UniProtKB/Swiss-Prot annotation:
GO function terms (MF aspect): metal ion binding; metalloendopeptidase activity
Pfam family, one: Peptidase_M16_C
Name of encoding gene: hypA
One Gene Ontology biological process: protein processing
Protein name (record): Protein HypA
InterPro entries with a match to the protein in the record: Metalloenz_LuxS/M16 (IPR011249), Pept_M16_N (IPR011765), Peptidase_M16_C (IPR007863), Peptidase_M16C_assoc (IPR013578), PreP_C (IPR055130)
Length: 973
């Protein structure tokens, strides 16, 4: 329909209409007349519709009330009176996104779906959740999601428990996370940004139930809301629904949700903090330093885009001068930079990890001297061109991976809208990009550096140093504090607390009423496609090399992958495959030093990457295919240069430049150490798979904890000639025509252009024939306890079901949904307090269950062991099974970006997995019934009896359970 400014549509006044050419949409900005709720609809042809409602929620302390509320409002509401409507939606919706997020100054609730009926259902449940939550009726919601005193018997130890409490204990375990929480405290000390909206575990137990509900009353009102709609949905219908069902029932309310601005400093602040490490760890090379500059108004689109480019130019590019200067000076092992435009005043951070103790002044001097040198002598124009091109490529490509476009646009809109700026300023980039391109012939970036960094007193230098025993001390203090609290309770109070825990358990264990479950809107099986999505793949040949062509529209961008089978690499050299991938593209070559190579890559492509990857041969048990994958994306017009660069890197990288190679090894080691804290569940599950499958054992050597140990050892041993010789040998074994496969995504016309150009690379590739290795890894029950200074655990258990004679069925994917959203969710998250838990049954036989930020070990493993009993007793009516089936099919039908489509198709090809197999899998999901789910009980029982476990987490907790492990060792070296 034709919308007109100043007209009223279902209670919403249309304030303005704006063409958003960069994203191919039209922005309609409304205000609700009665409540003054703000609403934006971006009209688009995109069928992946998005809805979000957000609120300004500046915290007044660090008890985490915004975060706890974000969890809690999704635990039942006026119309949807189940314990967790959110989980019911996860079970049975076709959503393409469903989540909620707490930021330092806002809380948002976004959903997305391609199905219109589903989209309206999601919008209904979310609006009811935020405006009419059951938190006022059930204090147990606050106890479960936030915190409570946990004690079952009078003689037991008193503990704290709660989902957010445990989540934040995990978040505060990582030095990276600690640093990123300290930085805002130093540059915004007088604002809400100095506080933890997520919650400081030391402060969370200070939050009362009364303060919790008061926060909702104050901020969760339409007058303080920012509502967003995106896609090809019926706008009038959407506005009418929001008004009639919700907003018309509210009056305008004056709400003070002002986000205060920090006054500038007269001089740079310098602050130092500590984090805990184990007694066995070395204090050296464990410090973190950051320089932080407040840039200014987040609603300035040009400045925001310019600093996105500058962050890449100074710290992220392989040619980045700040990174190079700091690494060359030996200050630290990994350098990164970040421009944060999601707060009222944006900030730019330069950060170094794994640095020596007490080097903060040297760090500051190197950064400031480098910046001054760039201003005085000018930034290399080629580096400027490369950095602008990289950022521009990403903007124009608009590939946000698995995230819906609408969600990304909402986040960009909120970066200005929340602060009363032009909501579209970060979407409309063309004008700003043209201004920034003037940097190629002016001092544009030099002036920014001088003004906002060199001469900026609103800045801070933050140091984070390791300290032994700090975590043990805090743990002992908490234990003592809880003992004192327990001793201060009279008998009546203690009985009340025990009684409250019982009531909470009863509520958690009581099934929802049938009528309440049926209040949650859901789709029927008629709403899902019976046919699996087919990605076009045609097997062709270019000069004798098998080439897979995926013919679909890519906006004249080539998405190219070269695969080289690595099964001629001997077992003892397997880790060097991972190392070779980390080095290629970051080292100098015959014709480029590494900085010039980085610039050439960014000028001509959207990136060239290298990775070690494995594929299971699904037609043969425990057989897999290891590959080295080279990927690039580039405009079709730049195909020739992209292929020349791939040849330059593959065939002419200088593997004798050991100074550069050692820098890369140290940086990779530092980044892996960060991942240990942030992705502990991945490490634990990889370990478990390595005990029971050859593929898992190989993956562990190229990307798991074994690979980390390998990097530590070669760095310590400093055997430079051995490293260089091994890399050369592995390179020669891998890059051969006999190992090669090509995958190309793009239309036929572009393919023909690529076909002619790629012949050059094929002609430069060796044609040697090497013997293939037969890998027979030592599998078995290694059961490792991996010690960290974290405060929570990641508990994994698994095995290989095919070794017990079981076969894969699509219904196993359904089982993952049932366990994840019913049994495991209730046993490990709701009752146990873990932040997350999920299972995975791979097509190759590998299987695992893993928890995330879990306060427990034994009770979690007991929950895993009780799965067969749950399955034997499993009951579900037709409605419940339909819900699970729809939710499982959703995982198969997510929108796929152009960059990922070809990856999926080639993974099927290399796994011997056909479209017919995919269709069969889909039918097995759709046709599964209760009996089929029950039939998996023996399989899970056999898996659990194998008793393959790995736990990564708190040292004290693991040592308390030492009988579970065959080997206990510290992770960080």
């Amino acid at each position: 329909m034709n919308f007109k400014e100043n007209n009223i549509y279902s209670g919403f006044k249309l304030l303005n209409i704006e063409n958003l050419n960069e994203i191919g949409g039209v922005g309609l900005r409304f205000e609700h007349e009665k409540t003054k709720a703000k609403l934006i609809k971006i009209l688009s042809e995109d069928d992946n519709k998005c809805f979000a409602i957000g609120f300004r929620t500046p915290p007044e302390n660090s008890t985490g009330v915004p975060h706890i509320l974000e969890h809690s409002v999704l635990c039942g509401s006026r119309k949807f009176n189940t314990k967790e409507p959110f989980v019911e939606l996860l079970k049975g919706s076709l959503n393409t996104f469903l989540n909620a997020m707490t930021y330092p100054d806002k809380t948002i609730y976004p959903v997305a779906s391609r199905n219109e009926k589903d989209f309206m259902n999601l919008m209904d449940v979310y609006l009811d959740a935020v405006l009419y939550p059951n938190i006022y009726k059930h204090k147990e919601i606050f106890m479960q999601e936030g915190w409570h005193y946990y004690i079952e018997n009078k003689e037991d130890e008193l503990k704290y428990n709660g989902v957010v409490y445990n989540e934040m204990k995990g978040a505060y375990s990582s030095p990276d996370s600690i640093l990123y929480r300290k930085i805002p405290q130093t540059i915004y000390p007088d604002t809400c940004y100095a506080l933890s909206s997520g919650g400081d575990p030391d402060e969370i137990p200070n939050l009362t139930y009364e303060e919790f509900v008061e926060f909702h009353k104050k901020y969760y009102h339409p007058s303080n809301s920012y509502i967003f709609l995106y896609g090809n949905g019926d706008t009038e219908k959407e506005l009418e629904f929001i008004n009639e069902e919700y907003l018309k029932n509210f009056e305008y309310k004056e709400i003070d949700s002002e986000i205060k601005e920090q006054k500038s400093f007269e001089s740079m602040k310098e602050e130092s903090f500590t984090y805990g490490i184990a007694e066995s760890e070395d204090l050296n090379h464990k410090s973190y330093y950051s320089l932080n500059f407040v840039i200014g108004d987040a609603t300035d689109g040009e400045k925001g885009l310019a600093f996105d480019v500058l962050a890449y130019l100074l710290t992220r590019s392989t040619a980045a001068p700040l990174k190079k200067a700091l690494i060359d000076a030996g200050i630290g092992k990994a350098v990164s930079g970040d421009f944060d435009n999601s707060t009222k005043q944006s900030a730019f951070t330069v950060l170094v990890k794994n640095a020596e103790l007490n080097k903060e002044e040297e760090f500051k001097k190197v950064v400031m001297d480098t910046l001054k040198d760039l201003v005085e002598n000018g930034i290399d124009k080629e580096l400027i061109e490369a950095s602008i091109n990289r950022v521009e490529f990403e903007l124009r490509e608009g590939d946000y991976g698995s995230y819906p476009n609408g969600l990304i646009y909402y986040l960009k809109v909120m970066d200005s809208w929340l602060y009363d700026g032009d909501p579209y300023v970060h979407l409309e980039y063309e004008k700003n990009l043209e201004k920034i391109k003037s940097a190629l012939t002016s001092n544009y970036f030099e002036d920014l550096i001088e003004r906002y960094m060199i001469n900026n007193t609103h800045s801070s230098l933050v140091s984070l140093h390791p300290e032994k025993g700090i975590n043990e001390k805090k743990s002992a203090e908490l234990k003592k504090k809880l003992e004192e609290i327990k001793n201060s309770f009279d008998e009546k109070t203690l009985n009340e607390i025990i009684d409250n825990c019982k009531k909470l358990k009863e509520r958690q264990s009581t099934p929802d009423k049938k009528e309440d479950l049926e209040s949650i809107p859901m789709l029927s099986l008629e709403d899902i496609d019976k046919e699996a999505t087919k990605i076009p793949t045609e097997e062709k040949e270019i000069d004798g090399i098998t080439t897979l062509h995926h013919d679909f529209h890519t906006n004249k961008i080539d998405y190219v992958n070269f695969f080289f089978n690595t099964n001629s690499v001997p077992e003892d050299l397997i880790p060097y495959v991972g190392l070779l991938c980390d080095i290629l593209g970051k080292c100098g070559t015959e014709n480029y030093d590494y900085s010039k190579l980085s610039n050439a890559i960014n000028i001509s492509t959207g990136g060239i990457s290298f990775g070690a990857i494995t594929f299971a041969n699904l037609k043969k048990n425990n057989e897999f295919r290891p590959y080295l994958e080279i990927s690039y994306k580039a405009l079709s017009s730049k195909t020739n240069k992209a292929i020349e660069l791939v040849d330059e890197i593959v065939n002419h990288t200088d593997l004798d430049d050991m100074d550069r190679i050692m820098q890369i090894i140290r940086e990779k080691r530092a980044r892996l150490e960060g991942a240990i804290f942030d992705s502990g569940h991945r490490i634990a599950m990889k370990k478990v798979l390595s005990y029971s499958t050859n593929r898992g054992a190989y993956d562990e050597k190229i990307s798991g904890l074994d690979y980390y140990d390998f990097l530590v050892n070669i760095e310590k041993e400093d055997k430079k000639s051995t490293i260089s010789d091994s890399l050369k040998k592995v390179r020669d074994l891998i890059f051969n025509k006999g190992n090669m496969l090509i995958s190309y995504s793009g239309k036929e016309e572009e393919y023909e252009n690529f076909k002619e150009k790629v012949k050059y690379l094929i002609s430069k590739t060796n044609n040697n024939d090497f013997e293939k290795e037969e890998y027979n890894f030592e599998l078995g029950k290694k059961n490792e306890g991996l010690l960290t200074q974290g405060n929570v655990q990641y508990v994994a258990k698994g095995g290989n079901y095919k070794t017990h004679g079981y076969k894969y069925s699509g219904a196993l994917s359904l089982l993952e949904s049932i366990l994840g959203f019913d049994y495991l969710w209730n046993a490990v998250r709701v009752k146990g307090g873990a932040y997350g838990v999920f299972s995975n049954f791979r097509r190759d036989g590998g299987a695992y269950i893993v928890s995330y930020r879990d306060p427990n070990i034994k009770s979690t493993l007991e929950a895993y062991d009780n799965i067969p009993k749950y399955l034997n007793d499993f009951e579900a009516d037709e409605r419940e099974m339909t819900k699970y089936i729809i939710g499982t099919i959703r995982k198969y039908d997510q929108p796929i970006s152009n960059g990922i489509k070809g990856d999926i198709a080639v993974s099927y090809y290399l796994s011997n997995f056909t479209y017919e197999d995919l269709q069969k899998e889909r039918e097995e999901i759709i046709n599964a019934d209760v009996e089929k789910i029950k039939s998996f009980a023996p399989m899970i029982k056999d898996l659990m009896k194998e008793d393959y476990i790995c736990v990564l987490g708190n040292e004290e907790k693991i040592k308390e359970n030492k009988d579970l492990f065959n080997n206990i060792k510290s992770v960080i070296k």
